Amino acid sequence: MLKPCVSDGARGISFARSPDELRRLYPPTRSRYGPCIVQEFIPHEGMQYKAELLLDRSSRVKLGGVYAKLRYYPPTGGSSTLNQTVRRPEIVEQGARILRHLGWYGMGDCDFIVDPRDGVAKLMEVNPRFTRTIRVLVEAGLDFPYELYRLAMGEVPRETSAYSLDIFLRYLPADLVWFLRSKDRFRTRPSFFRFIGRDLFYEEWSLRDPLTGVGFWFVLLLDMVDPLKRRSRLR
């Protein structure tokens, strides 16, 4: 798999099935997106997970949690559209081991995919930042933004790995496109048509701050009018 070092979603990713194909794909990809990395291809049938960790200046884990990417767009692999908090301590420890080896400090986001050939969760990438989906763990009880603020202010952040399970976070715009493009639209669990629940939250909307949602949808509608931005969002 050929992947740009700087990108988002699945933009720029391509798959080479031979050394010759890799040599053919690399120059135009690098020319368009900049430096790239080459990774082993893992069949996308395996579940994808995110391990979110906060490490102090001594690379000790203060907060750690995991959520599963139940749906994502494009359906063959990309940014998540529905996430669910789960308990996978071995994935937290695997991410922590990698970050400690790097002397990590602050927020670390580790992406994993379970290889269906051997059942092992394997690292895809590490992001040194908050991800768009961090809210699912915040709603589950791990307030990463606040604890990172405390760490930056020289305070001692709370240390815990306790959080609520089966909390869902949905990104509705991309989930709508997923529904249009996925063959599993009527087989997915939980159902695509479940829009309300005490355990269900939205990335782009909150009753506690509704105007941000209004602003988001207004900008999204403007993007749909622009042909270039529309193609980028609906790639």
Where on the chain are the PLM-derived regions?
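Conserved anion/nucleotide-ligand pocket segment
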Residues: M1-F15
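A short catalytic or substrate-binding loop motif that flags glycine-/basic-rich loops and adjacent residues
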Residues: S7, I42-M47, G103-G106
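Glycine-rich phosphate/pyrophosphate-binding beta-alpha loops
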Residues: A10, L70-P74, S79-S80, N127-G141
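Phosphate-binding site of ATP-dependent enzymes
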Residues: R17-G77, N83-A96, I113-K122
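Conserved metal-phosphate-binding beta-hairpin within the catalytic cores
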Residues: H101-R135
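C-terminal helical cap and adjacent loop that interface with cofactors, partners, or active-site loops
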Residues: D143-L151
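Peripheral (often C-terminal) accessory segments that flank ATP-dependent C-N-forming ligase machineries
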Residues: R150-R235
